[in-house]
Amino acid sequence: MRKASLLLLVPLLAACSSTLDAGQQYDGGDANYVMWDESERQDPVSASGTTFEGDDINLEDLRGDVVIINTWYAACPPCRAEAADLNAIAEDYAGDVTVIGVNVRDNAATAQAFERSFATPYESIDGTDGSFIADLEGTVPLQAVPTTLILDAEGRPAARYIGQINPEIVRGMIDDTL
């Protein structure tokens, strides 16, 4: 019986591990965030999508800028809780950083109501078909919302924060990426 229990535990523990956490922890042992040294960064990522307003956004067109990508949806409690912090970051770093939201679940009316309610100063891509996040596979967990990804000026993943952000930590990551 004990051997059978152990055999059941092995796949469960293996499922909890992830190669997404490769890289250097930015500060402390919090596994929710990671920042990669410049020499360890992956190749530039390529993804594109259309905002709820009908504008096309292509990450390749943003090379030369530091880009912050944040996945969210309107009914997500941590997404709502971090909205003011992301707005402040977008405003404080305007001109140095491009912030893009990726709504992974809502229809246009719901997403736009959220953006109006929180006075979001940046556009969000309609990511409900999953293709934008799928293009970031290996960098952003497909089901982890919210996730915030910071790309360096070359378009390479520099840092990632899974869950509701701590704005001081994310600001430090941005400063180190700039």
Regions found by a protein language model. Name each.
Residues 80-119, 129-135:
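Structural microenvironment flanking redox-active thiols in thiol-disulfide oxidoreductases
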Residues 57-80, 86, 99:
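Short active-site neighborhood of thiol/selenol oxidoreductases, capturing the structured segment around
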Residues 116-120, 128-176:
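Thiol/disulfide oxidoreductase modules built on the thioredoxin-like
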Residues 71-73, 102-105, 127-128, 164:
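Active-site-proximal beta-strand/loop segments in catalytic clefts of secreted hydrolases
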Residues 33, 57, 133-136:
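N-terminal post-signal-peptidase region of extra-cytosolic proteins
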Residues 37-67:
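A short beta-strand-turn-helix
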